[in-house]
Amino acid sequence: LNTILNPDENIKTYFKDADKLFDSSSIAHSDRWTIELPMELEIIKYLEYTLSKIILQIEREKPLTNNECYFYRLSLAHEYMHLEAFIMTARNLGFSIFNCHKKILNTDFFKSKKVIIKEKKLNKRNLNLEFLFDNETIQLNLNTKPYEIDTSPVSVESFIRFYENNGYSNKLLWSKEGWNWLLRNKNNTFINLCTYDKNRKFILNKWFGLDHLVDSNFPALHISFFEAQAYCNWKKRRLPTELEWMLATKKKEFEWGYVWEWTNDTFMSYKEFRPHPYEDYSKPWFNDHQVVKGTSFATQKKFKSIRFRNFYQKHRNDVFVGFRTVKDLL
């Protein structure tokens, strides 16, 4: 934020070596667990100090236009992302935070159906948005053909059926990369997370530290791209493209927003791409990640948008991510 303030108005750095502690652009993921961070109380003081200074700056500047509000909105969007990352971390470490997982556990899910999509055109509304990320300026290919798509993400019951039909032992269903991933991660798949008893009661094991009974229509989550792809091959279907997913949201039957959803699209650069001031947000991850759409139960409500382009590497199953399937009609 200091980059948009006058030199004599810059917010003073609270920690002398803050970048060495918190700069995600320069700290490798593998090193983040070993950094000697300040004590919790000191972190809280740091947050309160920074927030108070930013609020004063907003009151002084009184930003009104989209350009004037850009860095404030970027900071808020980034905070929304990290709030969800905190919840993901809590799940991994086995404790509850904000009780936000109760929302999805208490939701009644319905059996998924199929809906046919014939629309080809998507309104180009991105230029009118108050805020957008640099990767959201892409103009998607509009040459879609009619297709059939699930109205809901694949359920735990459907995915367990895939497992029962030798889905995890049939090498022909998996890509070469996916099969190698499976061999290395046999104890870290959806089948290790979700089990069932003789009465076919489905259980999420040690989810936020506790075992939870879930309905058969509960969305399968913590699914890697490789598992989703193998399931689609088993069903003789495929994952939707990003555009197909977005077009389907126009249908009232289309349910989304409880789990992120894998798409068939690689997160790529494009001819008109220009990085925004937060240069490391998109550019370093092109060609190495998969586009993920929607939101999860842990996402802040104000962050929900069909335009948002999330992205993860294919092996990631620590995320609250599931998928749905598509069938070509022509």
Regions found by a protein language model. Give the residues of each.
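Acidic/His metal-coordination segments adjacent to aromatic residues that form catalytic metal sites
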Residues: I27-E40, L64, L213
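Short, contiguous alpha-helical
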Residues: L1-S30, R60-D108, Y147, P153-V156, ...
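Extracytoplasmic and endomembrane cell-envelope/extracellular-matrix remodeling and assembly machinery
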Residues: K103-I117, N123-K124
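Surface-exposed recognition segments
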Residues: T137, E164-K186, E255-L330
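Core domains of carbohydrate- and sulfate-ester-processing enzymes
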Residues: T13-H29, K118, L173-L210, K283-T295
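Short Gly/Pro-enriched turn/cap motifs at secondary-structure boundaries
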Residues: N106, S112-K113, Q139, A220, ...
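Short, polar loop/linker segments at the starts of domains and inter-domain junctions
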Residues: P38, N126-T144, K304-K314
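Short aromatic-cysteine micro-motif
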Residues: P38-L51, E136-N166, L193-K252
